[in-house]
Every structure is written in structure tokens, then in C-alpha cells.
Amino acid sequence: MAKKIVAVIKLALQAGKANPAPPVGPALGQHGVNIMAFCKEYNARTQDKAGFVIPVEISVFEDRSFTFITKTPPASVLITKAAGIEKGAGESSKGSVGNISKSQLEEIAKTKLPDLNCTSIESAMKVIEGTARNMGVSITE
């Protein structure tokens, strides 16, 4: 029989830099999960993606064991890296803070496709384009 899931914890952590300090320790500790085991496993899985924030979804079972799924980095992080900017515009209507090309947009859409609620690259590109526009990043040909 399958184990019963007690809790699902969602965190966004730096790739390869999870440690027992907050926010990881308290979030996992209250469910009785072995914090160091999670940190070691997460760091091992994400060490090749250094510099990105990687969202993780941790399923905690009755017997205090756990499994986790790593997601793709947030679109905003991928867009800021591609545009070479520190952060998006405070007010996107006031003007552009940077720009990315269509090919960069397609690359980001391909990366994000498994986590987006769409099936084609074209629709994924539209979703990412909307995110970029809201951040004050313009799309160039």
C-alpha cells in the first residue's frame, strides 16, 4: 500500500546552497523530516544549476520520510539573466529596463515548458513574453 502524504512543502532555494538555517530548518523540522538528509540530496541534485533559485516541492509521509521534485527556475530569474539586468522595472509602463531577443525568449520558453500550463512552444513563448513585458523587458527581433 502507498504511504500516506502528511504535508506538501513548497520552497524556493538557491541551487546547491540549501542549509538547515531558515527557511529550510523550520519548514521541515515541524514535520519531523531529517533536515540534513534533505539538504544534502537537494544540493547534490542542483549543483549543476548554481546561481539560480530552484523551487522545490517536498512531500512528507506518515513515517517522516520524504520525496521532492525540483522545478525549473522562475521565469523572472531566467529573463533577468538573459537581459543582463539586476531586477525588473518597478513600473513596467514607464519604460524598458532591458531587452531580450526572440531566440532568447524561445530558449526560456523551452526551459519552462514542463512547468507551464501549456503544450506548445508558441503558447509558452506568449506566457514568458507577458512576464517579460510586466517586468519592463522588451522583446526584439
Swiss-Prot record:
PTM comment: One or more lysine residues are methylated.
Keyword RNA-binding: yes
Biological process according to GO: translation
NCBIfam families: L11_bact
Subunit architecture: Part of the ribosomal stalk of the 50S ribosomal subunit. Interacts with L10 and the large rRNA to form the base of the stalk. L10 forms an elongated spine to which L12 dimers bind in a sequential fashion forming a multimeric L10(L12)X complex.
Function comment: Forms part of the ribosomal stalk which helps the ribosome interact with GTP-bound translation factors.
Protein name (database record): Large ribosomal subunit protein uL11
